[in-house]
């Protein structure tokens, strides 16, 4: 009967468990909530629910498993919104005021949104259909597995022989192992036998972190008391521990989240993964997570004297061989699998979905706010509380929230061929060397038109002569089966045309400036501090001094290149709001010129857009300006990435890698850059991204292994002492490092770990170089020494210039230089400064506004010319901005 609670049947058991997941999401947050934040969460989640319903409608219903997973995901989204609307919001203190006669205009608008959502939930007829599908699917599963379950019960009753010798505890040996482990540095590897010793004597003091997909973790993992799973695809190397906790852990069970929150209380944290995974992605992510815990634990710092962070250097197979126990598959994982890797998981996850679809497309009829169509728009007032679990993109390797699998290391599996175009057809000719130092970053063999700044003083180089190649299947071993239509047309490849001289579209909601208009790129406007947002303000002032970038956003050209199919993009949310903030500042400066009253510009709407993509920026807490800078550049890149929907590149076969190692760094890095452009191709890449090589070398046989990493911000170490020069930091960055015994490289030639070295070399220098001075050590102590940085910086000696003329098979002409022609001289145009400690302090900036205005000091709303000639050379400098000069 209606209104009377019925006993839970087996058919409804799944719905109850799904509801409990929604309850955890809503009621497991101890942060004080306010009405606006909760409604924003409701609107975002309801949009996710609608997206799932559309997918269900378009799905082939013969694929019952996929349909069921989508229904479960939709059901959870619905229940989350239902809980907020019926159980949370009515009990907020602000709700009573907002529904009364003394409600403010803002509160009245929020209540309209509340009732709109309430009405939608009440009239929703799709949820009953979704519930029925979930129940029917469970019935089918139970029937299919009944016989299997019976056999499993019979097998489980059989007693297996026990090897008592294997489990006999040798206390002296174990204590010796533990003493050896305690002498290791954090970041070192341990063997299976050493981990077994720890678990026998120190299990309560041990936290294990499994860095594999949730499906693999549920199937089998190391059996111990305190263990959690952090999926390798759920984080990027640029994350902090707070982002891991607030974003990557969203789909994790409550007890795993609590264990991770207590991580600094454990004496040992051990990371492990599947070392036999072919792409090596899991291990690369394990190393990234290790670095995050050691170097970017800002929320809950890890004291190396109390907690050792180590990793298991053996495989799971060896763990079993050494007598280690494995915890097998849990049936509950079939019901509430919340993996965020692969396709069709239960939540799929909240973090990734909110990255991609947290905000609908910007309403193109309004420039005032960011509406959440078709619901009433949330007013653009300040948000200062609430950090409900939210997704993040990390956006690429932001570098890049949730990330896709990384760029596989260059070249095709089968042979050493330049797989430059990945899934595109091979070109019919190879351009010769490009002598233009600022040539745009276009993939080889495409007909991309360069995306050049209108202010670029250097004209495009004339089209170079073409060279026919008789052996041009080096592009890919699949080239002979590619559709020939692609060879005749490049229309499907990403296009970055030159900036037009007229407005890009008639119906654009944003005011745009044509390239023929005079743009005052030296505008000076203060930014309001929206509550510890100085870390945003200082970076915005410096970024907006990059003339090539701001012209593209001021004239609206950027909008033509937003790729809504980009896997890691925000579908234009970040780019549109970045452009709006820029135009607000530009117009404020213009009104100042004609005598109108002027003030500082608010960054609230822009900050809310950032928060919708990455929850790290959601509340009013202080953040690292470096993290924000990386997030912003990577976010803009993913929005504008013309190749953002392309599949990741294949990894090298051992034979191909060995062949690549025989090439010079100059040639090998250029090949890698061409491949990189097939998955990452945007104006941000063209303006800001560089590349460095990390080379391991065996000291016994001299074998090398080199990986190539793209960067938007180059982090250089600051040597200890009273003071140093910036070039000293680059010397430190590029010096050869002798690896410790426990860090030694497994040499493929020697077939064992050998004494080895590691060396970083800069292989590509960008047009605009952003340098981060690494002032914080692993213990979060700040190095405050004065780094003397010059106004003109020559980095030519640090650029790889080892070309010996040797090219890979099949290439008869030089690979395009892409602007990599020495010398590499840079002029300083911005400096973000930090005062205080990592946990508190203040950010300001110095920006060069051109010959007329000179250097300007910015401190939120306050700005002024520098008071003496070299005031901008500050002992507090933290992030430096340099622009390449060509004459």
UniProtKB/Swiss-Prot annotation:
InterPro entries: Papain-like_cys_pep_sf, Peptidase_C19_UCH, Rhodanese-like_dom, Rhodanese-like_dom_sf, Ub_carboxyl-term_hydrolase, USP_CS, USP_dom. Residues 525-885 form the USP domain. It catalyses: Thiol-dependent hydrolysis of ester, thioester, amide, peptide and isopeptide bonds formed by the C-terminal Gly of ubiquitin (a 76-residue protein attached to proteins as an intracellular targeting signal). It is found in: Cytoplasm; Late endosome membrane. This is Ubiquitin carboxyl-terminal hydrolase 4. It is a peripheral membrane protein. It comes from Candida glabrata (strain ATCC 2001 / BCRC 20586 / JCM 3761 / NBRC 0622 / NRRL Y-65 / CBS 138). It is an enzyme of class 3 (hydrolase). It holds the Pfam family Rhodanese. Belongs to the peptidase C19 family. The lineage of its organism: Eukaryota, Fungi, Dikarya, Ascomycota, Saccharomycotina. SUPFAM superfamilies: Cysteine proteinases (SSF54001), Rhodanese/Cell cycle control phosphatase (SSF52821). Residues 387-402 have a biased composition (Polar residues). The keyword Hydrolase applies. Gene3D superfamilies: Cysteine proteinases (3.90.70.10), Rhodanese-like domain (3.40.250.10). One of its GO terms (biological process) is free ubiquitin chain depolymerization. Residues 202-328 form the Rhodanese domain. Its EC number is 3.4.19.12. The keyword Membrane applies. Ubiquitin thioesterase that acts at the late endosome/prevacuolar compartment to recover ubiquitin from ubiquitinated membrane proteins en route to the vacuole. Also removes ubiquitin from soluble proteins targeted to proteasomes. Is essential to maintain a normal level of free ubiquitin. Required for promoting coordination of DNA replication and avoids DNA overreplication. It comes from the Eukaryota. GO terms for molecular function: cysteine-type deubiquitinase activity. RFU1 is an inhibitor of deubiquitination activity.
